């Protein structure tokens, strides 16, 4: 019991957590467990939770223990076993608790252990059938109260079969039943039953089976000795045979028909028939009920016992019953029975099998059944003696067989089509053969559709496999059937099929069978096979590989594949047109692969098509790759331009002795694989009259042009032919050959022509002067004209070359125009525009800027002999007849046109004039485009009239027909329809005022039309409603705008739109311009009263909505200041006016305009006195009343001083504390406001009495002048009377009433609503005016009067009793209102909150009270809520009229004002201070890398802390449980702290990138030997000294370590000076870390084990280590300040050992190291015979000391080698090295001879020295090992925080085996504190 009492407090805590904790989804499988008390066995029960992992515990393990099942590493499980452990018979309870290790949720289960009071056997039935499935019997145990035990698992029972004393008729009844074990059956028992059966025990569940028919009794008792007095449970079971009646269903018969019944028995799963009549069973007809029109004396049916046949006699019904012949069995069991209905036939029905659909297929067999139904649609049994006549049309059906009664027919459909089957029930044949014909035969017919079988074409399709699903599609054609099919595929991975029969290949290889099922009968289908095989090879078939540019080549492909099923058979695919081929062209741009593939042909299955885009050759590669399959085929292609004659195109004409270079282009080029096959051939008809030669290199591989030089040697005509191509080859089996021909003409000239040369091509029009005078041409008098001389033959063909002619030039008036000698005629071959080059003789004529007329002539006098000789002309037969030409020139000025550009409106009535001046006077006008404008030239006026025809732009070109000049005069005409209308108007106008609207009409180019066109457009401006009026103004803003005046006449919103009528009569409207007529703009409040330092926000009403922008200003800035948001702050006593201006921006000009304005008077004053605003001074006990402080006038509300800075403090008191309670306004939610916010309080009446309520208002800073006369405080006091509520003392009953305000209503509800009939009545007398009214539904309505009425409520109960309630209804005016707030806030350690948490949502409820303080049940107040500013809280309407919702959004003080609109006296003020609820307070910005320990005192009602979250986890990650936050990236973030279902607060944090990251070396005074090789560098991220912000709890510190913040930084190290040839990372390693104690990041630097080479190099030169830190994730540059860490590699000796002898008694050794080590270096010898002295000290680079080592005793070593050691040590760093010293004594064996000893003696001497040296080395090694274990044994060291190598003697035991030098620490009495740095403790010195 003592132990139990110790557990109780924890239990109550767990119970409390469970009671108040939030509801979660996890549940236990049972809330209470009832277990039986046992001694011999243990009864178990398994508890299981729905989810989670739990720790289980029991409050009383001695009653019930709990053991987890399958416990995990966290020592938790989802299941546990409860076991009864009670040792004494009693009823005791233990509580089982399960605590979720993740959420802390606690689940409970009560485990009750009690005695079994009684048992009973339960089963699903009490009847068993012989040899049927066994029956399960189970025992239920009950306690003394009748409760059922949860389990009896493990409890042993004795089951026995006893004789049934009641079964008198059964012999040996106890042998009729058998008890089975589950092991003998096929059923799975509970696990504990299996275990008990293995131990030959019986549990609470058994199986029994019937052995023979009869009755048997089964008894079960508890074997446990404690339950020997519990009465055994008994059950009686009946074992029966399983008898069936066939048919077992109800049967419908026609009169005269019969049915044969069978009696069957089920045994061992088989059905056997009993022969009837039987000794055991008999059939009987009972309960014969004839039809009402039938004969009651006759039976409905007759049963023939011998045949078990029932014959229907008349209509009605009768029951057929199978009964026992034995009397004792008749009541013992229930045998089957059937009901027989004798009915009249109603109609016939048809069924067909298979398919049960009357859509058949020719050639198929079908079973047609004709069924008879009565009028109720019951199916009539088809007796053999009915006769149905069926008609199957012979042309459609072949009847194979039919039943005797005609109800069944076996037929075959033989022809397709539509037909009808008919049948009629005609008669019934009795047993004697008599035929009874039905008076009205029953007839029906069935329509049948017969189709031919469905066949699919083709029957087989073969496709290559491709990885892309759906690469191939094929439309399968289906023939036969109804024509409407459903398609299916046997393997959708191989091929799929759509509803239209489109087959699509899948992604696998194999076979798919496609089936088309007839929709009208799915049993009918056709099928075909689709093979998808894997391709194995691919090649191109022989084809043409050369093509003209623009032509297409078809390249056929032959693709083979492997048949599926593992066969190696290779077959050519017949169709691979959709093969997923990759076509690649080596030279891009020559051939373009075309989409699509070639259709399959006899020699190919697919192919690609390419188009020749440009001449050239390329290689085309077609490949296919997927997995292990890679196919490819390559072919070379060539493209060529068509061979054509370029110059001349058909005929070339030259003079004798001239030549023509004929140009041909295109044709096939040399075949790239065999260029030698290329050829060109040129021929002529007569080789003697012309000379032919091919130009260009003959071996060129790039034949794009072919030049043939033709020279005229005799007059006449010749045909010249050129052919180009390649000869056939293996790679080009079908080459292309291109031929072409031209004619060459050699003739004398017959005429010459002279024409002026124009700078630009002119129109094909002649000058009228030229037509009149034939050779008169006007030219400009300012430019030298160029004359073109041309020659023509007799047929009028122009000569291609006439250079062999001799030409003479002449001018008739050289003063106007002359031929200069220095400007001879230039012979130029020019293109005539179609690629033909003709020879032109160009002669320049010099003009002298004078007007007039002159003539120029040219004459061909003969041939030039030099040309004839060069051409090889043999003989000139006829001399040339001279030919000449002349031209007359008129010199004039150039033409001009104006205006040069104009835009006109497309309207028939619009025209524009173009003025044409200067020129020759002969003009031709045309336009650049057709159908845009119509131009008419009036030559008499010199004006061109332009009329618009169609929208667009056109250029009018004025051509001077008689003047050559560079270009015609031009004027650009823009014709445009109306593109859009643009309305510009200010979108806001105050009612009663006006603004101007401007309208422009824009053309296609968004340019405005001239206003003169508006008359053609019918421009109108309209408003959508009548709230504005429009007046057209005559004033013009410019030449493009129409102006209107817009008057606002009514408030609202409307739109303005302008419209015009275009050329076609259609109205074109502008975009509607929204315009708002707004009410006068008003600022609220109309007057502002403030004290100095107080603040209020001015809001507005009216004005445009939404208000785009309001600018506030004040006329007296010394009195008050106003912000852009309208916040007014009092500065000094005085008056001012705040002006609010509503502005808008003009959409077109961008200027700001004033839409409306208003002003508010501001008064800043000092508080002269204060008053307590109390709505009543007499209040009833138990009621509440709000009070607040005001000034002496009504304007001086809490809004005037409640938020002043510096503030006022309010101190409240009462003279009698027991009468009144003073409570803060937020007392109900556990917020205690500071005195600065207590201008409003709640007064609670406690006991009757009279007391004074006093307030003292103090100024925090009297010098601020907030109180009158710089006073320090003001006060006020009122008296309040508290009185008791009237009560009845005798009798002591409560008299309640309904309190309502005038004109309010309430719906009354009772606890009898819906159960009783309620009536309501007001009991006022007839002479009294009713105060309230109530209707029959309980709606109680008060009038405008006040008073008291009595209401009667009567409930008429359904059981006859009436209940009556009389209630007083008081109608009273509202005296005051009071505000309350919810929800209640809870803190962790009952801390007092002083403000609302930031981010919290609270609900304010307004309560209404009468003059006594009672709360109204109904009211009609219309409440308004307002705040003095809107930037700290957000306010909104609540669910009801008397509530509002406020959400705190920023830190600061807001004042809330609530008032009744109709009753100005009903108001209240509440302060709403808002503070952060999340700590810590951050003085500056958070930098990336900072760690915050966030905390909040807020908890849930159950004491559970909330969860943390972050709006941006990538910026600031927050641990949801502990509140640890890590700044990971820069940016703004919001941290949320949420108590689920209660509140949610937040804190806004800005994370910035640190400006710098500073690393500092951490100085430590003492470390252990394990730390001797490491140095730590602290890293400060940002400007703070610590990156850990806030007070961190132990749990938060653990969370920080788990989050690994050090992953945010990385550490780098390098030598400060680059003096080594290896990087610092070869010597040192660095790891980042974070120290929660320091609140800083760390870089731990560790020195590696050094090699001898590294050790030597580090001692030769000196530098330090620079350690820096960075943030890899930083996207901006960050200043990095590194830390300098000095290090020392340790001592190093230039000798590994010293060998001394009597011949060499001394030696030198150098010890290298740092200066600070060497300055205090000490040496110690292991033997007094050996001494070391300093010879030299060098503290430069490198630093070393040279020691002389000598032997003091010359005889040392004479008795044997002397082995010792020198130890060099530094007390500053605890470093030491040991050098072995060996002293040997060597005898001198040299004789006195001149050459010393003999060779033998030298050998002996040498052998002796070698032998001695060997033993000396052995001794030295022994000394080294001894020194190692002596000096380097582990001990506690006082070493600095130094970076040294990791290798220590205990870490590298093999190190000294290869080096005789070792590191030794100094004795403890010589330890010293060295300077901080990095030191090396142990290295070899070689």
UniProtKB/Swiss-Prot annotation:
Residues 1866-1886 are annotated as: Disordered. Residues 1-25 form the signal peptide. The modification Phosphothreonine is found at residue 1844. InterPro entries: Big_2, Ig_NUP210_4th, Ig_NUP210_6th, Ig_NUP210_9th, Invasin/intimin_cell_adhesion, NUP210-like, NUP210_Ig1, NUP210_Ig15. Glycans are attached at residues 337, 484, 681, 1039. Pfam families: Big_2, Ig_NUP210_15th, Ig_NUP210_16th, Ig_NUP210_1st, Ig_NUP210_2nd, Ig_NUP210_3rd, Ig_NUP210_4th, Ig_NUP210_6th. Residues 1078-1151 form the BIG2 domain. This is Nuclear pore membrane glycoprotein 210. It comes from Rattus norvegicus. The lineage of its organism: Eukaryota, Metazoa, Chordata, Craniata, Vertebrata.
């Amino acid at each position: 019991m003592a132990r139990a009492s110790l557990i109780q407090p924890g239990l109550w805590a767990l119970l409390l957590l469970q009671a108040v904790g939030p509801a979660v989804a996890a549940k236990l499988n049972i809330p209470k467990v009832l277990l039986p008390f046992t001694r011999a066995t243990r009864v178990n029960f398994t508890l299981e939770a729905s989810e989670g992992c739990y720790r289980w515990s029991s409050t009383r393990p001695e009653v019930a223990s709990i053991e987890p099942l399958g416990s995990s590493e966290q020592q938790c499980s989802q299941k546990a076993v409860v076991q009864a452990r009670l040792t004494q018979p009693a009823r005791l309870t233990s509580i089982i608790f399960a605590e979720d290790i993740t959420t802390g949720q606690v689940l409970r289960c009560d485990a009750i252990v009690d005695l079994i009071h009684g048992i009973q056997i339960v089963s699903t039935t009490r009847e068993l059938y012989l040899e049927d499935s066994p029956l399960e019997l189970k025992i239920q145990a009950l306690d003394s109260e009748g409760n059922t035990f949860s389990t009896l698992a493990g409890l042993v029972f004795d089951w026995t079969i006893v004789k049934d004393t009641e079964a008198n008729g059964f012999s040996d009844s106890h042998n009729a039943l058998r008890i089975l074990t589950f092991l003998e059956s096929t059923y799975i028992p509970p696990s504990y039953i299996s275990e008990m059966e293995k131990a030959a025990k019986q549990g609470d569940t058994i199986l029994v089976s019937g052995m023979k028919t009869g009755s048997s009794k089964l008894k079960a008792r508890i074997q446990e000795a404690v339950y020997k007095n519990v009465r055994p449970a008994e059950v009686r079971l009946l074992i029966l045979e399983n008898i069936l009646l066939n048919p077992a269903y109800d049967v419908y018969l026609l009169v005269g028909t019969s049915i044969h019944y069978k009696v069957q028995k089920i045994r061992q799963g088989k059905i056997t028939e009993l022969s009837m009549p039987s000794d055991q069973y008999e059939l009987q007809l009972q309960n014969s009920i004839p039809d009402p029109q039938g004969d009651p004396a006759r039976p409905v049916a007759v049963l023939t016992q011998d045949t078990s046949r029932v014959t229907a006699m008349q209509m009605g019904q009768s029951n057929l019953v199978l009964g026992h012949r034995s009397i004792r069995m008749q009541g013992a069991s229930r045998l089957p029975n059937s009901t027989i209905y004798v009915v009249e036939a109603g109609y016939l029905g048809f069924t067909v099998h298979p398919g049960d659909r009357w859509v058949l297929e020719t050639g198929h067999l079908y079973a047609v059944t004709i069924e008879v139904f009565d009028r109720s649609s019951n199916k009539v049994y088809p007796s053999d003696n009915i006769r149905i006549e069926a008609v199957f049309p012979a042309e459609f059906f072949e009847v194979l067989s039919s039943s005797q009664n005609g109800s069944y027919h076996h037929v075959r459909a033989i022809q397709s089509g539509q037909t009808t089957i008919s049948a009629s029930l005609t008669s019934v044949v009795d047993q004697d053969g008599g035929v009874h014909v039905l008076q009205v035969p029953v007839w029906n017919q069935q329509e049948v559709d017969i189709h031919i079988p469905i066949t699919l074409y083709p029957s087989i399709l073969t496709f290559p496999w491709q990885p892309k699903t759906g690469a191939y599609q094929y439309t399968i054609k289906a023939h036969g059937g109804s024509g409407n099919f459903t398609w299916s595929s046997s393997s959708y991975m191989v091929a799929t099929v759509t509803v239209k029969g489109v087959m699509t290949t899948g992604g696998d290889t194999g076979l798919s069978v496609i089936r088309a099922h007839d929709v009208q009968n799915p049993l009918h289908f056709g099928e075909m096979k689709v093979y998808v095989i894997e391709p194995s090879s691919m090649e191109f078939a022989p084809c043409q590989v050369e093509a003209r540019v623009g032509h297409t080549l078809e390249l056929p492909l032959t693709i083979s594949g492997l048949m599926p099923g593992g066969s190696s058979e290779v077959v050519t695919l017949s169709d691979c047109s959709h093969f997923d081929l990759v076509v690649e062209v080596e030279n891009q741009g020559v051939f373009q692969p075309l989409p699509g593939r070639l259709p399959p042909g006899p020699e190919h299955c697919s192919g690609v098509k390419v188009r020749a885009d440009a001449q050239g050759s390329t290689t085309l590669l077609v490949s296919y790759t997927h997995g292990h399959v890679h196919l490819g085929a390559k072919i070379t292609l060539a493209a060529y331009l068509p061979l054509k004659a370029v110059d001349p195109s058909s005929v070339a004409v030259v003079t004798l002795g001239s030549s023509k270079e004929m140009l041909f282009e295109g044709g096939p080029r040399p075949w790239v694989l065999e260029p030698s096959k290329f050829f060109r051939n040129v021929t002529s008809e007569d080789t003697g009259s012309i000379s032919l030669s091919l130009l260009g290199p003959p071996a060129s591989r790039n034949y794009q042009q072919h030049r043939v030089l033709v020279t005229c040697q005799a007059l006449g005509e010749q045909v010249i032919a050129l052919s180009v191509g390649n000869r056939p080859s293996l790679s080009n089996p079908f080459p292309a050959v291109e031929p072409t021909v031209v004619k060459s003409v050699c003739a004398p000239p017959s005429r010459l022509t002279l024409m002026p040369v124009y700078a630009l091509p002119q129109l094909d029009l002649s000058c009228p002067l030229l037509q009149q005078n034939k050779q008169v041409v006007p030219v400009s008098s300012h430019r030298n004209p160029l004359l073109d001389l041309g020659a023509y033959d007799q047929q009028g063909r122009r000569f291609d070359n006439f250079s062999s002619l001799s030409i003479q030039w002449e001018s008739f008036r050289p003063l106007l125009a002359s031929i200069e000698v220095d400007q001879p005629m230039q012979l130029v071959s020019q293109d005539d525009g179609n690629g033909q080059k003709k020879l032109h003789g160009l002669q320049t004529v010099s003009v002298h800027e004078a007007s007039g007329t002159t003539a120029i002539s040219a004459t061909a006098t003969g041939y030039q002999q030099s040309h004839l000789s060069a051409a090889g002309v043999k003989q000139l037969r006829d001399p040339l007849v001279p030919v000449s030409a002349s031209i007359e020139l008129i010199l004039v000025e150039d033409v001009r046109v104006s205006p040069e550009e104009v835009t006109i409106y497309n309207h028939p009535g619009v025209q524009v004039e173009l003025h044409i001046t200067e020129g020759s006077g002969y003009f031709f006008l045309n336009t650049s485009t057709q159908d845009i404008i119509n131009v008419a030239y009036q030559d008499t006026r010199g004006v061109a009239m332009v009329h618009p025809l169609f929208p667009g732009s056109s250029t009018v070109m004025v051509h001077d027909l008689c003047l050559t000049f560079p270009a015609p005069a031009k004027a650009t005409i823009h014709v445009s329809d109306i593109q859009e209308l643009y309305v510009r108007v200010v979108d806001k106008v105050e009612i009663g005022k006006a603004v101007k609207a401007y309208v422009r009409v824009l053309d296609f180019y968004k340019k405005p039309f001239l206003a003169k066109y508006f008359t053609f457009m019918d421009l109108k401006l309209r408003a959508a409603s009548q709230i504005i009026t429009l007046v057209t103004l005559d004033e013009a803003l410019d030449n493009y705008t129409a102006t209107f005046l817009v008057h606002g006449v009514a408030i609202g919103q409307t739109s303005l739109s302008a419209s015009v009528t275009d050329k076609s009569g259609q109205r074109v409207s502008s975009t509607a311009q929204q315009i708002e007529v707004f009410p006068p703009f008003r600022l609220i409040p109309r007057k502002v009263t403030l004290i100095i330092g107080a603040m209020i926000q001015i809001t507005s009403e009216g004005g445009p909505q939404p208000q785009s922008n309001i600018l506030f200003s004040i006329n007296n800035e010394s009195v008050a200041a106003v912000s852009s948001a309208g916040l007014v702050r009092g500065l000094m006593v005085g008056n001012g006016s705040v002006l609010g201006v509503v502005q808008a921006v003009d959409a077109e000009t961008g200027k700001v305009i004033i839409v409306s304005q208003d002003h508010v008077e501001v008064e800043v004053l000092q508080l002269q006195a204060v008053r307590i605003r109390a709505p009543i001074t007499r209040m009833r006990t138990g009621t509440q009343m709000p009070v607040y402080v005001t000034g002496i006038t009504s304007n001086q509300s809490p809004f005037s001083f409640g938020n002043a800075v510096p503030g006022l403090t309010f101190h409240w008191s009462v003279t009698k504390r027991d009468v009144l309670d003073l409570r803060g306004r937020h007392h109900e939610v556990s917020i205690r406001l500071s005195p600065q916010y207590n201008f409003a309080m709640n007064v609670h009446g406690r006991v009757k009495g009279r007391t004074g309520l006093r307030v003292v208002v103090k100024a925090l800073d009297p010098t601020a002048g907030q109180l009158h006369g710089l006073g320090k405080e003001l006060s006020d006091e009122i008296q309040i009377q508290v009185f008791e509520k009237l009560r009845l003392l005798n009798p002591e009953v409560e008299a309640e009433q309904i309190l309502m305000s005038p004109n309010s209503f309430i719906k009354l509800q009772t606890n009898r609503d819906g159960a009783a009939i309620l009536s309501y009545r007001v009991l006022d007398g007839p002479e009294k005016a009713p105060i309230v009214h109530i209707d029959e539904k309980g709606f109680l309505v008060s009038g405008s009067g006040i008073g008291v009425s009595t209401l009667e409520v009567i409930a008429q109960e359904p059981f006859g009793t009436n209940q009556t309630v009389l209630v007083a209804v008081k109608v009273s005016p509202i005296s005051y209102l009071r505000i309350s707030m919810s929800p209640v806030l809870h803190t962790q350690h009952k801390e007092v909150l002083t403000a609302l948490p930031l981010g919290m949502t609270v609900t304010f409820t307004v309560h209404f009270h009468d003059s006594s303080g009672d709360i109204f049940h109904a009211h009609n107040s219309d409440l308004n809520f307002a705040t003095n500013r809107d930037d700290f809280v957000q306010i909104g309407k609540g669910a009801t009229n008397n509530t509002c919702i406020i959400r705190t959004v920023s830190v600061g003080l807001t004042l809330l004002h609530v008032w009744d609109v109709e009753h100005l006296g009903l108001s209240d003020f509440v302060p709403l201070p808002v503070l952060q609820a999340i700590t810590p307070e951050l003085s500056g910005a958070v930098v990336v890398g900072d760690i915050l320990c966030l905390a909040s005192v807020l908890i849930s009602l159950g004491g559970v802390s909330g969860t943390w979250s972050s709006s941006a986890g990538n910026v600031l990650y927050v641990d949801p449980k502990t509140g640890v936050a890590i700044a990971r990236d820069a940016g703004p973030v919001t941290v949320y702290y949420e108590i689920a279902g209660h509140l949610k607060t937040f804190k806004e944090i800005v994370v910035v990138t640190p400006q710098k990251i500073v690393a500092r070396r951490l100085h430590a005074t003492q470390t252990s030997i394990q730390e001797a090789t490491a140095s730590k560098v602290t890293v400060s991220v940002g400007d703070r000294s610590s990156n850990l912000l806030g007070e961190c709890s132990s749990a938060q510190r653990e969370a920080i370590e788990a989050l690994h913040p050090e992953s945010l930084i990385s550490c780098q190290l390098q030598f400060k000076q680059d003096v080594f040839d290896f990087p610092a990372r070869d010597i040192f390693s660095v790891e980042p870390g974070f120290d929660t104690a320091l609140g800083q990041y760390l870089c731990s630097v560790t020195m590696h084990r050094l090699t001898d080479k590294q050790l030597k190099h580090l001692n030769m030169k000196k530098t330090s280590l620079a350690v820096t830190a960075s943030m890899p994730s930083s996207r901006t540059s960050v200043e990095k300040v590194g830390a300098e860490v000095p290090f020392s590699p340790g001592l190093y000796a230039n000798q590994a050992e010293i060998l001394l002898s009597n011949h060499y008694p001394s030696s030198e050794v150098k010890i290298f190291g740092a200066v600070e080590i060497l300055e205090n270096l000490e040496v110690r010898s292991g033997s007094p015979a050996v001494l070391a002295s300093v010879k030299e000290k060098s503290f430069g680079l490198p630093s070393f000391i040279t020691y002389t080592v000598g032997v003091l005793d010359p005889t040392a070593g004479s008795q044997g080698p002397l082995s010792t050691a020198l130890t060099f040590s530094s007390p500053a760093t605890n470093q030491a090295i040991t050098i072995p010293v060996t002293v040997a004594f060597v005898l001198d064996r040299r004789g006195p001879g001149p050459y010393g000893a003999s060779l033998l003696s030298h050998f002996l001497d040498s052998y002796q020295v070698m032998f001695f040296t060997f033993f000396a080395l052995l001794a030295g090694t022994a000394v080294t090992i001894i020194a190692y274990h002596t000096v380097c044994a582990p001990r506690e060291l006082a070493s600095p925080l130094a970076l040294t190598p990791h290798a220590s003697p205990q870490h590298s035991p093999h190190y000294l085996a290869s080096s005789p030098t070792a590191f030794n620490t100094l004795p403890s009495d010589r330890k010293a504190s060295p300077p901080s740095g990095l030191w090396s403790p142990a290295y070899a010195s070689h």
